């Protein structure tokens, strides 16, 4: 076999088929036609025109069976532990002023659009760039996965067109950052350095032996899950079409705006009108200013400044018949927004002024 290079083969291939096993060894090329010498264990040497080694140029990365994020229709429950510690539940029965709300934590609604975007980021997580395919305890510590920054436990389900559940399960995902690199990054922040070092981020599915490197943007998107990040940023979340009248208090004066439905309420092409002191006006500027009023950050700080404006919106909603919003001046940049008497958020004073000006345009134009 030595003359064919089969005493020290360049490749040995072990094949098992049922109860049979075979060993194929690849030797040198023939000098005449550059064909490969092979042995299949039957004591003979063969020349093959197609080199079997061409089919075995895959590296380990090509052969790993990567973990995957399952496809599902509904996230029934999402639990966070680590940097955040709370649970989100999917509930179509709980009442909320926003008809689209189906995700809640401790009875408080979250923004369905934001949760959906987060779930999309989870679905699209790229689990291909492995850093360990048989992770050890020492490696877990090196990757920061012995104490993950965030652990996500998601109970999911899928249903057919008739609403019958076809699949369900639980996904556990651990996310971390390299501890040494993170410490260097935080030190650079503290020292106000101009150039900040990179921090490697990792993901691990459940107790899988495979650990993946993920991008910083993927890590940031999946770990930005504080209650304030996932709750509604807009102050008024009801459908404005459910508003039937508005009581306004501005600079000590009271005003009432009234919605007048069309005579034929079943005709979708006919719109109702808004009036103030029996004068019809266009509600768009007011409704837009109200709908874009959003939190710059959230607070429970009691207001001490001057009241800028107060609105009580009457809604065609048995569970939430009224919504009262009062804005108090904080400084030249911000106001404190109180909803039904409770401080909720800081809002831009510019946006508050837009709302005030929309009211003045109606009252002064009547």
Each model region followed by its residue ranges:
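Secondary-structure "cap/kink" motif recognition
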Residues: 1-366
